Amino acid sequence: MDNLGESPTDKAGEPGESEETRATPGAPVSADTEGIPEETDQVGDADSKEAAAEESELKSQDVSDVTAAEREDPSLLTPAAKKLKLDTKDKKEKKQKVDEDEIQKMQILVSSFSEEQLNRYEMYRRSAFPKAAIKRLIQSITGTSVSQNVVIAMSGISKVFVGEVVEEALDVCEKWGEMPPLQPKHMREAVRRLKSKGQIPNSKHKKITFF
């Protein structure tokens, strides 16, 4: 009988224990469910970073596309940029045209040279004043040191000047009915003629008197 009296309470307690024991295995499950949002947050952060990177790439690509489109389509440029682009393009075309014209004229001129003129032209092209001597001369006159660019410029100008004097001397020799080689009298007459034409500046200092 005692066993029969205790059985209801025991039976009532056993289901309670079974419910607790059934509830306890669920505890890790709740812990797992709490951990799932953390993983989703990390995934969300990674997705947002990837989205931001993709957006920046798209923006840079759009900017590059716009600049490329502006280069291809002049109508997208601003008026100042259009004018600058046209000016540089015109300058390049004009310079290229001038260079081509000069080359063509030079080719025609050289093709019409005689053998003697061609030899003289080749000698003139290869000739050059020694830059060290030109530099010493400039420094002795000015009393100051000069740069290499000034020496190169003066050397080229001197070469052109001597070429003009020699050409004028050859004309004098031909006019006098004489044959080359050139003599000092031909050179002196050539310098005199160039001075009379105003192509050689007067080296003598003239005092200007004011009345």
UniProtKB/Swiss-Prot annotation:
Cell location: Nucleus
Pfam family, one: TAFII28
Cystine connections: none
Chain spans, region Disordered: 1-98
This protein's UniProt keywords: Acetylation, Nucleus, Transcription, Transcription regulation
Any one GO biological process: positive regulation of transcription initiation by RNA polymerase II
Modified residues (N-acetylmethionine): 1
Domain of life of the native organism: Eukaryota
GO molecular function annotation: DNA binding; nuclear thyroid hormone receptor binding; nuclear vitamin D receptor binding; protein heterodimerization activity; TBP-class protein binding; transcription coactivator activity
SUPFAM superfamilies hit by this protein: Histone-fold
Residue ranges with Acidic residues bias: 35-44
A cellular component term, taken from the record's GO annotations: nucleus
Gene3D superfamilies: Histone, subunit A
Record family assignment: Belongs to the TAF11 family.
Domain notes: TBP and TAFII18 bind to distinct domains of TAFII28.
Oligomer and partners: Component of the TFIID basal transcription factor complex, composed of TATA-box-binding protein TBP, and a number of TBP-associated factors (TAFs), including TAF1, TAF2, TAF3, TAF4, TAF5, TAF6, TAF7, TAF8, TAF9, TAF10, TAF11, TAF12 and TAF13. Interacts with TAF13 both in vitro and intracellularly; also interacts directly with TBP.
Protein name: Transcription initiation factor TFIID subunit 11
Lineage, broadest ranks: Eukaryota, Metazoa, Chordata, Craniata, Vertebrata
